[in-house]
Amino acid sequence: MRPFFIPRLMTCLAVLTLAACQSRERTTVDASSQSPEAAVQQSIALVRAGDFAGFWQHALPPHDYAMLREDWGQTRAGEAPLSDAERTRIDATLQQLAAPDAAAALDAQLQPWLADAQLRYGDQLPLLVGIGRALAARAIEDDPRLTDTQKRHAAALVDALGPWAQQAPWFDPARARQAVGVVVATARELDVRDAQSLRAMDFDQAMRSYAIAFHGLERMLALYGLELDKALASARVVPLEYHPPYARVRVEYQLLGTPLSLESTLVQQNGHWYDQDLLENVRKAHRQLAAPATAGTVAALP
């Protein structure tokens, strides 16, 4: 069974997310020293703007941010090299997206398959979405990296997205043509040439490429009725507890008309407020990255 075309287009955007591109300076107001609510609201604003480098710089203390950037390079250097098959597949995808007639060529391939897919799977879509929801719920429950609060929020997200996924016009030819245009436009903005350039990017290049791909994904999902920017714009931060150096807030927002919320504990360091779970996750990842080298060093000592 061939996958639906939307996941295929999203895969293209995922590849493009890794693209190298030019960096730019950010100009944001540091709200983390003002209040816990202002710190969280600024994080949301940075994500909405696609300023992921700015988000990390805002969301982490200076030492941890520098550590994150250094760990990024070490992680990339330690990755297994791409196989010949992987490199060939990525290069072919990028070349196809970069071709002058990319949009027309992809649309010509997509439209017949789209009509066939509607005949084959149109009536089964509610069932397939239901299966997907069940699998997602199980994966969330079994994920050891998520806190109980995060699991509840993720499960609520899946529940909110389910009805939309069942009713979205996935097989509409005009929307599919527009979605292809978004993917091709995103590829041209990123201007990535081959698989090697994906592996050679530094932290700043990666964050900038994430921004381009993120906005491309936003535009594509909006074609099918899922407006991520609208959801982010609706977010408001409600204070719950304030006992420095700790505080607790609730982020409330609307997704597809469904009210959702997520509680967060913040910790104050040097006058700035940071999300406790995010900070601990970054430090845990650093410890795990450093563990093999530390073990090797200890073993070598007499």
Annotate each language-model stretch with its function.
Residues 1-10:
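Bacterial N-terminal signal peptides that target proteins for export
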Residues 17-20:
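C-terminal motif of bacterial Sec signal peptides marking the signal peptidase cleavage site
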Residues 22-24:
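Bacterial signal peptide processing site
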Residues 34-50, 55:
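Short, aromatic-enriched amphipathic alpha-helices that serve as compact interaction elements
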Residues 51-63, 194-200:
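Short, well-ordered alpha-helical segments enriched in acidic and aromatic residues
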Residues 61-83:
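Short, charge-rich amphipathic alpha-helical segments embedded
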Residues 80-98, 221-237:
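A short, amphipathic edge element
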Residues 99-196, 205, 248, 259-292:
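Short beta-strand edge/turn micro-motifs at domain boundaries
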